[in-house]
Amino acid sequence: MARIAGVNIPTNKRVIIALQYIHGIGAKNAEEIVTKVGIPAERRVNQLTDQEVLQIRETIDRDYVVEGDLRREVAMNIKRLMDLGCYRGLRHRRGLPVRGQRTHTNARTRKGPAKPIAGKKK
């Protein structure tokens, strides 16, 4: 089992699929990494040499923001919006949808479970 960017990569999957287990690397980025390193697309992780794993690791460290750093960066961006007091920051602070979705009937995921209203009993 190869360990890249602090994540255990599954050994029996193709490299492009296995790299997507790293937070911040999707299908396009995984394909790009494999092309840069020069590994055939159908190669599986358990067929990689130590040199190839090292090259993948170096490419990710050099060119991509992944895992904890990415999570921290996103959290800092949201915190910055909230500190600025802009509209998006206020929506984050209140736990409401940020991107203009309606809230009259929907947005239960963002708002949480429905709160009962007193005086609605028969």
UniProtKB/Swiss-Prot annotation:
Region (Disordered) residue spans: 95-122
Keywords on record: Ribonucleoprotein, Ribosomal protein, RNA-binding, rRNA-binding, tRNA-binding
Pfam families cross-referenced by the UniProt entry: Ribosomal_S13
Domain of life, per lineage: Bacteria
InterPro entries attached to this UniProt entry: Rbsml_uS13_C, Ribosomal_uS13, Ribosomal_uS13-like_H2TH, Ribosomal_uS13_bac-type, Ribosomal_uS13_CS
An individual GO BP term: translation
Cellular component GO terms held in the UniProt record: cytosol; small ribosomal subunit
GO molecular function annotation: rRNA binding; structural constituent of ribosome; tRNA binding
Keyword Ribosomal protein (UniProt): yes
Homology family: Belongs to the universal ribosomal protein uS13 family.
NCBIfam families found in the cross-reference section: uS13_bact
Complex and partners: Part of the 30S ribosomal subunit. Forms a loose heterodimer with protein S19. Forms two bridges to the 50S subunit in the 70S ribosome.
UniProt function note: Located at the top of the head of the 30S subunit, it contacts several helices of the 16S rRNA. In the 70S ribosome it contacts the 23S rRNA (bridge B1a) and protein L5 of the 50S subunit (bridge B1b), connecting the 2 subunits; these bridges are implicated in subunit movement. Contacts the tRNAs in the A and P-sites.
Name under which the protein is recorded: Small ribosomal subunit protein uS13
Protein's gene: rpsM
